[in-house]
């Protein structure tokens, strides 16, 4: 079932020895995707991935089978559709967290243009240092790790965390 259903039937503490367990696993797993070529709609480490494909692949590695199928989508789906489809999917399966409480392993959601649905996601890979770092599928290139500079921070609209039972 959905995260809401799982939360209602599972202990609040989840499993594992601490709250950072799943986030640390996600961040480590994301680094293994670095260099994976950008491929629209793909989700295969070392072969191809887009931003959603990276998150889907990390889910498979950390939590198991994907919880729902992803219908085909065009590169301009956010501009054409108007609905917050990516945000809605993340809200179904991940736990929303405040931007101030973000930690490594959290999934970040970005809105690239005002008035358009949020359409890019990344994984926060490090919070220490001069500014945070993130791992994401860079359009037309590859999965990369980059600084989350001012340009990205201005476009950040939400953050989500993998459930502890993952």
Predicted feature residues:
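Residue-level detector of flexible, active-site-proximal loop/helix-junction positions
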Residues: 45, 129, 141, 163-166
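Intrinsic disorder/low-complexity segments
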Residues: 1-19
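...with weaker cross-activation on analogous glycine-rich loops/strands in unrelated enzymes
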Residues: 20-27, 68-144
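Hydrophobic/aromatic-lined pockets within catalytic cores
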Residues: 34, 59-63, 126
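Surface-exposed patches in mature extracellular/periplasmic domains of secreted proteins
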Residues: 38-43, 66-71
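Active-site nucleophilic cysteine motif
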Residues: 43-62
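Non-catalytic ligand/cofactor/substrate-binding and regulatory segments of enzyme domains
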Residues: 20-36, 147-166
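Short secondary-structure junctions
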Residues: 38, 93-98, 155-158
């Amino acid at each position: 079932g959905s995260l809401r259903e799982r939360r209602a039937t599972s202990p609040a503490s989840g499993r594992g020895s601490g709250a950072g367990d799943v986030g640390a696993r996600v961040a480590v797993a994301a680094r293994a995707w670095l260099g994976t070529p950008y491929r629209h709609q793909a989700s295969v480490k070392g072969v191809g991935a887009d931003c959603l494909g990276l998150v889907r692949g990390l889910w498979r590695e950390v939590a198991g089978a994907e919880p729902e199928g992803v219908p085909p989508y065009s590169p301009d789906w956010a501009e054409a559709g108007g609905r917050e489809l990516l945000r809605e999917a993340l809200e179904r399966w991940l736990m929303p967290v405040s931007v101030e409480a973000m930690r490594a392993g959290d999934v970040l959601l970005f809105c690239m243009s005002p008035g358009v649905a949020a359409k890019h996601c990344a994984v926060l890979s490090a919070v220490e240092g001069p500014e945070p770092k993130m791992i994401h599928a860079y359009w037309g290139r590859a999965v990369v790790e980059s600084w989350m500079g001012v340009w990205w921070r201005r476009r950040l609209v939400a953050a989500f965390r993998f459930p502890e039972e993952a």
